Regions:
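Anionic ligand-binding catalytic core segments
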Residues: 1-203, 207-238
């Protein structure tokens, strides 16, 4: 691939996978960290973590990663829930899901929707995974207050599809420090999701968090053109 996995622009001569500036922007390092796992290894680890009940919530396999230094090089290693990054590897059920999610996030940025930091990342077997930097953790690893709409509307996780966007909007108006701005952002995100075939925006995919001493709607995350990934699903919205 001749384009940067972070910004999609052409790489310069001698660069591999990411521009130097993009590495610095996403990881805060001068060299690209190593993700020394294969797709098969991540599948096995994800199953083990789910059995141990230390996985992040959601249907798509997600692994928590921590950036550390090992023998002089930066490496991303799988940890418990406290990791600063979330990794979504390829799946056998849905082809190229990481690429589709990253592209959908890029399209949101083009539409001037604020999104969480994200990138594609090459693994040891040359397959690509999707990485996002967590916004509910500080650079020191401390937890930031953040609650999703299941919590804010008092719904169990298994009932995340049994609600309405009207109810989410009312929760934004009730709890946000800038309610009019955030409910507008929420509406724009719904419109974008409909336009891009994202029919999986359930209650867990909207959250409020503490930012600069204010309670705000979080930047968008988990945006995926589900219709491309699963053409048999003809729903328009969650």
């Amino acid at each position: 691939m001749c384009n940067c996995l972070y910004c999609y622009r052409p790489l310069l001569k001698g660069e591999k996978d990411m521009h130097q500036a993009c590495i610095k922007k996403f990881f805060g390092t001068t060299t690209l960290p190593v993700l020394d796992y294969t797709m098969e290894q991540l599948d096995q680890l994800a199953l083990q973590i789910i059995q141990d009940q230390t996985s992040l919530t959601g249907v798509q396999p997600k692994l928590s990663l921590h950036l550390n230094e090992h023998e002089g090089s930066k490496r991303l290693t799988i940890v418990g829930l406290w990791g600063g990054y979330i990794c979504k590897p390829q799946t056998s059920q849905y082809e190229m899901m990481p690429e589709v999610e990253d592209l959908t996030m890029h399209l949101a940025e083009v539409a001037r929707i604020e999104v969480v930091p994200h990138t594609l990342m090459r693994m040891a077997d040359d397959s690509l995974c999707y990485l996002t930097r967590r916004i509910d953790r500080t650079s020191a690893g401390e937890k930031t207050a953040m609650e999703d709409m299941c919590q804010l509307t008092e719904r169990q996780t298994e009932h995340k599809y049994k609600s309405s966007y009207e109810r989410v909007g009312k929760a934004v108006l009730k709890y946000s420090s800038l309610p009019k701005m955030d409910v507008t952002n929420f509406f724009e995100l719904l419109l974008f999701s409909w336009l891009t075939g994202n029919n999986d925006m359930h209650l867990k995919n909207f959250s409020l968090y503490e930012a600069a001493d204010k309670i705000r709607l979080t930047p968008a995350y988990d945006l995926l053109n589900a219709v491309i990934v699963n053409p048999k699903d003809d729903e328009e919205l969650a």
